[in-house]
Amino acid sequence: MNFILSEMTFLRYYMPLIIEAKNRGIRSRVFVGRNNKYNNPRAFVDYIGDLSRVHKFEILDLDEAHKYAGIVFLVEGVEHNKVDNSKTRIVSLTYMTDYSGLYDSYVNKVDHIVLPSKSFAKAYNKNSPKNLYLGSPKYDVELNEEEILRKYDLSGSKKALVIAPRSRDLGNAKLAQIYKTLNSHGLEVLVKTRGKDPLAKSLHGDKYFTDPSWYPHTTMELIHISDIVVNFSSTAIKECVMLRTPLINFHIKPFEKPLKFLYEYDYCENFGKEFSENQLQNAINRLTNQDLGDTFNISIEKHLFTGSSSKRILDYLELY
């Protein structure tokens, strides 16, 4: 099998498929490209090499991709023109909600498009016979709390993960107040941002993270070990639901929140830019003390998926 890696963020989707393929005796090739962003694979060749040695996949230059036949995985149609579609079967994986704007540009250039569920296609009216509702391989990763705590040198105390807003929205986020309130509940404040959206040191909370780990991805690891998440309408809502971590969401984006259907459950408290200290205190109390297992189950069953997506995807491709 072949994988087009033009952004490091794609690894979290590819690695579970590569591992599942290896378990079936199928070798994989990863074609490494480049970009001018913080997630340029060329800046992480040693990291990719380490993964290759552990998981036994071959690394080649993206310019070599057109020489190879078989199944090709890519993300959101990116670099589809680098492969020879006369001898390949192109499978495009969707990336969070990027497909809402990109889908139409590649739907006629690929053979299959893997979406988490029909809810995701319906939400943005992206329907095609090419759609495969098989989940997302990104979540086929075993996360161990003790290993994550050791990896990031964290204590076993209760934790709140703040997924920082984009720089564009930072002026509407009352981060200092939120941190103070979380700390008052005995919660260690972990702050996660993207490499392209750094925060001032005064907003680093108790521990500050960018993207030290591409696979497993840092955000998923931190959600897994946290008791509650503070979100600003990022698509990390999907990770919170899949990992069953309750969240407080502050909608400060200048447009409608993506995947809004996932916010309409009791595992989430929704606020706008303005909120009172009492409201925030009550939200933290409820979410950290209430059993939310049933509401997570309902949301996952209705909108998402269970089980191994990697197995479903490879089963489908082997069958057809």
PLM-predicted stretches and their roles:
Residues I59-A65, G195-L243, L247, P254:
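Donor nucleotide-activated moiety binding/catalytic core segment of transferases
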Residues V107, K126-N127, Y133, T235-H303:
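Catalytic binding pocket for nucleotide-activated donors in carbohydrate/polymer assembly enzymes
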